[in-house]
């Protein structure tokens, strides 16, 4: 037979349930940020999921009653998560670009190195002063071509140095013609970086694309000018943003809007 509990212990009410039983207002509890789970997983999907959960928490009707310390902590975590998402997406995009243009860069680097050897050999054999001046220019062009194939910015679309041209009977003229053809504007930037110092070329290679730089500049300017709008921004499952006005639409208006929009785009902040 089990031992019966005394009536005093049965009648005791837990303090957390006392307000509910007596009819008082229920006290809301806010869960602490689950940083350990995100850090342990480390995947982009986990970071996006955590960011969406924070956005939903901050955009709920009762978010104004949230303690200031909890809200500040969530907003700080949200900023850190956005930075991690942008960094991981940029890293993924970088790897894609490197793999995409790896072979063409490799072959053009080898070709430029062969042209350097060829022009140096021609320069050693040349006796005409005008020819020597022209060959020195060709040698400089070939040396810049080598660095062009190596240090062309990873995040930008690679432009070939030696596109397919008509074959000539004179192989020497064909090789020199490759060095005297028109060059891409980035070629001039690489030439200037070679004169600036050893750190200039790696910086040019790892620079952000013009599109990404413009996007980050706009987002920073928006966060500085309207910080309250950035914290209240909502992200849906596909990464799209919607402000508070769209979140307050009636179900009928939302259904009409979905019918007009049709299929949503798969591109977004959290994809």
UniProtKB/Swiss-Prot annotation:
Keyword vocabulary terms for this entry: Coiled coil, Nucleus, rRNA processing
GO cellular component, one term: preribosome, small subunit precursor
Residue segments, region Disordered: 1-44, 196-271
Matches recorded under Pfam families: Efg1
Primary location: nucleus
Compositionally biased spans, kind Basic and acidic residues: 8-20, 217-246
GO BP terms in the entry: maturation of SSU-rRNA from tricistronic rRNA transcript (SSU-rRNA, 5.8S rRNA, LSU-rRNA)
Subcellular location: Nucleus, Nucleolus
Acidic residues bias: start-end ranges: 257-271
Coiled coil: 69-128
Domain of life where this protein originates: Eukaryota
Family under the similarity heading: Belongs to the EFG1 family.
Annotated protein name in UniProt: rRNA-processing protein EFG1
Species in which this protein is naturally found: Pyricularia oryzae (strain 70-15 / ATCC MYA-4617 / FGSC 8958)
């Amino acid at each position: 037979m089990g031992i019966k509990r005394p009536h005093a212990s049965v009648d005791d009410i837990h303090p957390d349930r006392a307000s509910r039983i007596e009819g008082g207002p229920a006290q809301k509890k806010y869960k602490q940020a689950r940083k350990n789970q995100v850090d342990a997983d480390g995947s982009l999907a986990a970071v996006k999921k955590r960011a969406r959960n924070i956005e939903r928490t901050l955009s709920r009707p009762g978010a104004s009653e949230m303690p200031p310390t909890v809200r500040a902590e969530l907003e700080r975590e949200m900023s850190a998560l956005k930075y991690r998402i942008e960094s991981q997406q940029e890293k993924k995009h970088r790897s894609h670009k490197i793999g995409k243009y790896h072979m063409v860069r490799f072959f053009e680097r080898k070709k430029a190195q062969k042209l350097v050897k060829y022009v140096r050999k021609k320069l050693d054999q040349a006796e005409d002063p005008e020819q020597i001046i022209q060959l020195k220019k060709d040698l400089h062009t070939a040396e810049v071509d080598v660095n062009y194939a190596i240090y062309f910015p990873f995040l930008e679309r690679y432009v070939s140095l030696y596109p397919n041209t008509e074959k000539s009977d004179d192989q020497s003229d064909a090789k020199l013609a490759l060095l005297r053809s028109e060059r891409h504007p980035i070629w001039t930037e690489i030439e200037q970086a070679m004169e600036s110092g050893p750190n200039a070329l790696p910086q040019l290679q790892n620079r952000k694309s013009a599109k990404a730089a413009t996007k980050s500049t706009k987002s920073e300017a928006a966060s500085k000018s309207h910080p309250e709008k950035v914290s209240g921004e909502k992200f849906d499952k596909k990464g799209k943003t919607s402000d508070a006005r769209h979140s307050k639409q009636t179900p009928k208006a939302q259904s009409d809007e979905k019918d007009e929009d049709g299929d949503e785009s798969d591109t977004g902040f959290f994809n």
